[in-house]
């Protein structure tokens, strides 16, 4: 363990980067449902008490800012807590979506309280510079159809019937905005719990899918709004991952340029946005493939040429030098001369 940590510390130091998003949770099954974490807490099993140690070592020895990367809704907590339900057109019974993150409903007060406890426990056991809210804070245009959500919609003046909401274009648009704000408000509530323990200096960042940035009207499918993110968080972490979005390899460059152009159209957006590239090509069958270091370096160069100031990648396999540091570090620092080191 110590040797692995030393390898990570040296790699981060050699890269001369400013920030690391450090995962505070474990997902050994790869299904997106968080059953274990890397810090002591009151609700979930602790896989190992290492988050605090690794965060401290990275901050003190590598000089980077650490953002604790935490889920918002995809926690495997008490089975009596309300889960997000979806109600497809023509169906009468709401159910948990079989192909989406299994998420807790943000409209259940008990959910908010228990997730808040996890954030408080993290803040009480580790020092860090910010929080990164995971990409699981989303609701499709068929969600949330759980009982607490329906009650919240009614209290906000919406129809009880999601089908009728969907058939009314104006109400459908307002409903999407309501859900977007509800998710954002929940994350701000969580950040307030962290700041109450660690201090007001804690920064916030949140993952957003690329489509709500490229096509703002797709807020209806995600309950994510780029303009809201820019106002609400210190940083918006855009998942600039073409293959994950089904973009063909030959079209990936143009897709990234389209994304950067959209960012440039919004004042101050590029100063508050971080583009997260993919270092792995995820497959539904689990046979994930590493993206070549040359390709990743090319994408980084492309982002720079299109005016992007802040970017990173995920995942980093530091034990196997993937991606290769001598190929990607020139895209982070001009002080890198590998043949002279």
Which ranges hold each PLM region?
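Active-site-adjacent "subsite" loops/lids of carbohydrate-active enzymes
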Residues: 1-2, 65-126, 161-169
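Substrate-binding cleft of secreted/luminal carbohydrate-active enzymes
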Residues: 230-252, 256, 262-341
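Substrate-binding cleft/loops of secretory-pathway carbohydrate-active enzymes
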Residues: 141, 200-245, 288-289
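The substrate-binding groove and active-site-proximal loops of carbohydrate-active enzymes
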Residues: 1, 35-48, 98-116, 171-183, ...
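Aromatic-lined substrate-binding rim segments of carbohydrate-active enzymes
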Residues: 6-13, 26-77, 86, 170-201, ...
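Aromatic-lined carbohydrate-recognition surfaces of secreted/lumenal glycan-active proteins
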Residues: 65-75, 132-140, 169-221, 269-282, ...
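Aromatic- and acidic-residue-enriched segments that line the glycan-binding/catalytic groove
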Residues: 34-43, 74-98, 135-166
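Catalytic domains of carbohydrate-active enzymes, especially glycoside hydrolases
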Residues: 3-30, 124-130, 229-237, 302-311
């Amino acid at each position: 363990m110590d040797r692995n940590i030393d390898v990570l510390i040296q790699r981060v130091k050699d890269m001369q980067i400013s920030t690391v998003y450090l995962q505070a949770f474990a997902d050994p099954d790869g299904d997106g449902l968080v059953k274990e974490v890397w810090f002591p807490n009151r609700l979930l099993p602790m896989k190992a008490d290492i988050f605090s140690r690794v965060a401290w070592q990275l901050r003190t020895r590598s000089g980077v800012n650490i953002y604790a990367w935490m889920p918002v809704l995809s926690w495997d907590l008490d089975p009596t807590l309300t889960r997000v339900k979806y109600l497809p057109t023509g169906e009468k019974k709401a159910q948990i979506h079989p192909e989406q993150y299994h998420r807790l409903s943000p409209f259940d007060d008990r959910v908010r309280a228990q997730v808040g406890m996890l954030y408080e426990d993290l803040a009480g056991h580790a020092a860090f510079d910010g929080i990164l809210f995971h990409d699981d804070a989303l609701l499709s245009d068929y969600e949330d159809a759980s009982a607490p959500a329906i009650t919240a919609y009614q209290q906000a003046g919406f129809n009880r019937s999601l089908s009728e909401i969907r058939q009314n274009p104006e109400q459908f648009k307002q409903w999407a905005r309501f859900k977007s704000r509800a998710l954002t408000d929940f994350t701000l509530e969580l950040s307030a719990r962290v700041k109450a323990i660690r201090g007001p200096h804690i920064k916030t960042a949140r993952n957003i899918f690329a489509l709500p940035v490229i096509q703002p009207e797709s807020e209806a499918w995600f309950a994510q709004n780029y303009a809201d993110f820019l106002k609400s968080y210190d940083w918006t972490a855009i998942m600039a991952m073409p293959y994950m979005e089904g973009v063909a390899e030959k079209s990936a460059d143009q897709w990234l340029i389209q994304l950067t152009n959209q960012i440039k159209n919004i004042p101050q957006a590029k100063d508050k946005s971080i583009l997260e590239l993919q270092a792995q090509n995820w497959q539904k069958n689990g046979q994930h493939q590493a993206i070549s270091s040359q390709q990743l370096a090319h994408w980084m160069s492309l982002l720079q040429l299109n005016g992007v100031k802040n970017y990173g990648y995920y995942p980093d396999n530091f034990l196997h030098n993937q991606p290769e540091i001598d190929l990607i570090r020139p895209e982070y620092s001009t002080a890198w001369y590998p043949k002279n080191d």
